[in-house]
């Protein structure tokens, strides 16, 4: 039998905020999905990636994939 893959799918969510017409700030809601092996990377992932909603490179933080 083949070994079970140890990689987990995690969701990286943009931390950028966007101001709405009413003046309140909300997250852009943009995210991407990556694989992470918890044996090799025990800490949560953080990347600076491009967010097309705000058209800038911003910090993306790991969240659980639902």
Curated annotation (Swiss-Prot):
Q: What is this protein called?
A: Large ribosomal subunit protein bL33
Family recorded in the similarity comment: Belongs to the bacterial ribosomal protein bL33 family.
Q: Which organism is it from?
A: Wolbachia pipientis subsp. Culex pipiens (strain wPip)
Q: Which UniProt keywords apply?
A: Ribonucleoprotein, Ribosomal protein
An example Gene Ontology CC term for this record: cytoplasm
Which gene name belongs to this protein? rpmG
Annotated GO biological process: translation
The answer to whether UniProt assigns keyword Acetylation to this entry is no
User: Molecular function (GO) terms listed?
Assistant: structural constituent of ribosome
